[in-house]
């Protein structure tokens, strides 16, 4: 059986932490920012840790050797 490939979009969007959690960028910053408050925009900076159920799905389906 051939080796499974990691999805290239997944390896660009997600990183695994040392403890095995999945880190991702914040969502909701592509357009429509004019109607957001400055606090909302500021809080969307940086990265966040995914929920365990979502992270498990990402790892199982898209990053087979992670």
UniProtKB/Swiss-Prot annotation:
GO cellular component terms, semicolon-separated: cytosolic large ribosomal subunit
Q: Name one Pfam family in it.
A: Ribosomal_L35p
Q: Which Gene Ontology BP terms does the record give? A: translation
UniProt xrefs under Gene3D superfamilies: 4.10.410.60
Q: Which GO terms describe its molecular function?
A: structural constituent of ribosome
Instruction: Identify the stretch annotated as signal peptide in this record.
Output: none
**HAMAP family membership:** Ribosomal_bL35
Q: Which family does it belong to?
A: Belongs to the bacterial ribosomal protein bL35 family.
Q: Which PANTHER family match?
A: 54S RIBOSOMAL PROTEIN BL35M, LARGE RIBOSOMAL SUBUNIT PROTEIN BL35M
Protein name, entry field: Large ribosomal subunit protein bL35
Per the record, the gene is rpmI
């Amino acid at each position: 059986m051939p080796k499974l490939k990691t999805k290239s979009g997944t390896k660009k969007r997600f990183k695994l932490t040392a403890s095995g959690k999945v880190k991702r960028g914040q969502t909701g910053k592509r357009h429509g920012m004019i109607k957001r408050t400055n606090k909302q925009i500021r809080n969307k900076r940086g990265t966040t840790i995914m929920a365990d159920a979502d992270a498990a799905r990402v790892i199982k389906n898209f990053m087979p050797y992670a």
